[in-house]
Design a protein with these regions (language model features):
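NAD(P)+-binding Rossmann beta1-loop-alpha1 motif at the extreme N-terminus of oxidoreductases
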Residues: 1-58
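NAD(P)-dependent Rossmann-like dehydrogenase/reductase catalytic/cofactor-binding core
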Residues: 2, 162, 169, 208, ...
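Nucleotide donor/acceptor-binding cores
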Residues: 3-4, 31, 71, 119, ...
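A structural signal for isolated positions on well-ordered beta-strands in alpha/beta enzyme cores
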Residues: 7, 32-34, 100, 148, ...
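Short, well-ordered alpha-helices that flank and scaffold nucleotide-derived cofactor binding pockets
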Residues: 20-24, 87-91, 114, 275, ...
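Internal alpha-helical scaffold of NAD(P)-dependent oxidoreductase catalytic cores
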Residues: 25, 62, 91-92, 115-120, ...
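Short, charged/polar "capping" segments at the starts of alpha-helices
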Residues: 41-46, 109-110, 157
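Rossmann-like NAD(P)(H) cofactor-binding subdomain of soluble oxidoreductases
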Residues: 53-138
Length: 322
């Protein structure tokens, strides 16, 4: 198997890392590379391209129909966008298409597999400390951990694992193949829950975890709940590589994706983080009080961004805490 065509669904911070890494191959005409988009989003991409680390890239923009039959589909969407994109994914995938989801959380592969079949899905994750600025997406190529992927069961060095390795090997994309991809995905999930969420409530950079015993206590509480659920599901997090217990190197001012979303007035992926853990906790009979509080706090911050608590001009309206 040789990968000669790649479609990226989702041209945000994660999708831009893949686009950046494969752009030289596309420019050399050794790879067909396109971003899947429709309507106004497609028009913006055609007009403005994607600005990555200060450089503007103009990828091909494909409809799902035009992307049908690509060798590799990279799904790099926000969690809330996935349900609306499942029809597009079904359209894109042919008998030969391999699908890699680089989305956060632990269930995007299952949701995609339910639509196209598990045989198409090559489990994967990405660790890239990218962020949006006024001039596009920025990340540090050197400190980025990159893409980790692998088969759930033997043979671990399958044809498609080798094909993806060959695709990434002579690019700037950092990658690693693992025989413990399920544990690696859950290890990243643990990082997201414990490191993304407390700082989002506080509104402070990641330095808060080392500078505040109180924020660390919240992070540790979230971690204990997640690890209890993982253990109940038979997931041995100790099998994840040591490098997977931490994220990419960042300054103490860094703001991870959940806080970036709140800063920008966007809704977050909290349903995929604490929301998923609350659901699994109920199914397994495991209490999740730290995640329940965190879930409702971040939902309330979303409501605040939506203007729900704008009481301008209501000074004379009596009310009380209920």
């Amino acid at each position: 198997m040789k990968i000669q065509s790649v479609a990226i669904l989702g041209a945000g911070a994660v999708g831009c890392y893949v686009l950046w890494g494969l752009a030289d191959k596309a420019a050399a005409n050794t790879l067909q590379l396109g971003v899947v988009a429709e309507d106004s989003r497609a028009e913006r991409l055609r007009q403005n391209g994607c600005t990555i680390n200060g450089q503007v890239y103009h990828p091909q923009v494909w409809t799902p129909q035009q992307a049908h039959g690509v060798d590799l589909l990279i799904v790099a969407l926000k969690y809330g966008a996935l349900p609306r994109a499942l029809d597009s994914i079904r359209t894109i995938v042919s008998e030969r298409t391999v699908v890699m989801s680089l989305m956060n959380g632990v269930d995007s592969e299952e949701l995609i597999a339910a639509q196209v079949g598990a045989a198409h899905v090559l489990p994967a994750l990405i660790k890239v400390a990218s962020h949006r600025t006024e001039d596009g997406v920025r990340f540090d190529p050197e400190t980025t951990i990159g893409i980790i992927y692998g088969e759930l069961t033997a043979p671990f060095d399958s044809d498609r694992v080798q094909a993806v390795r060959a695709l990434f090997a002579d690019t700037g994309i950092h990658f690693r193949v693992t025989e413990h991809i399920r544990e690696e995905i859950w290890s990243k999930f643990r990082l997201n829950v414990c490191n993304n969420l407390p700082q989002a409530i506080l509104g402070a950079g990641v330095g808060c975890y080392s500078d505040s015993a109180h924020i660390k206590a919240i992070s540790d509480g979230l971690r204990r709940e997640l690890e209890a659920i993982a253990a109940a599901k038979g997931i041995d997090l100790s099998k994840a590589a040591a490098a997977s217990t931490h994220g990419s190197t960042v300054p103490p001012t860094a703001r991870y994706s959940t806080l970036q979303d709140l800063d920008a007035g966007r809704h977050t992926e909290i349903d995929m983080f604490s929301g998923a853990l609350m659901r699994m906790g109920r199914e397994l009979g495991i209490p999740t009080p730290y995640n329940e509080y965190t879930y409702h706090m971040i939902k309330a911050l979303e409501e605040k961004n939506d203007g729900l608590f704008d009481y301008s001009g209501k000074d004379q309206e009596p009310t009380w805490a209920k």
